[in-house]
A protein has these predicted regions:
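Short, glycine-/small-residue-rich phosphate/pyrophosphate-handling segment
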Residues: 96-135
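N-terminal beta1-alpha1-beta2 submodule of the flavodoxin-like/Rossmannoid cofactor-binding fold
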Residues: 1-92, 122, 126-149
Length: 149
């Protein structure tokens, strides 16, 4: 199984990456750190834009884990930017058959913050034909989900 972890955190080895390693323990997976790639905002035309590379990595994966710290009560900007850029660029259903998991962690997020982030990721999965596997917010949940993978 080809597993891709998309790390939206600017800290490549921080809490988001740590939860991913706990979730994916015992599995081979590839990490794509969004901070390593130039991805312009929706409507920008940057010559060095790497969104097509990110999309190609998603298309090659069987399972996708998107990780984001909670910033300003929601998903971080780098993940939001990628989701925004999918609009019009990627056909609905083009990621059909893939499973999407969402790592969403922060220093003490309130329930409504987690619900808002999860709503976004559920809609993203649904729009592009993916099965939504669930949201992981802490070590205990990562260990529970690991058993299902």
């Amino acid at each position: 199984m080809n597993i891709l972890f998309i790390n939206g955190s600017p800290n490549k080895n921080g809490n988001t990456a740590s939860l991913a390693s706990q979730l994916l323990e015992g599995h081979d997976y590839k990490t794509l750190n969004l901070t390593d790639h130039v991805i312009g905002s929706f409507g920008q035309n940057l010559e060095q834009d790497e969104l097509d590379f990110v999309i190609s990595q998603l298309e090659q994966a069987d399972m996708i884990v998107v990780g984001s710290p909670v910033y300003w009560h929601n998903i971080c900007g780098s993940v939001r930017n990628v989701l925004d850029r999918f609009y019009g660029k990627v056909k609905e259903g083009s990621l059909k058959g893939k499973t999407l998991y969402f790592i969403f962690q922060g220093a003490a997020p309130e329930k409504w913050m987690l619900e808002a982030g999860e709503y976004t990721m559920r809609r993203f999965a649904s729009l592009y034909g993916m099965e939504y596997g669930g949201m992981i917010t802490n070590t205990k949940e990562a260990q529970e989900f690991t058993k299902e993978l």
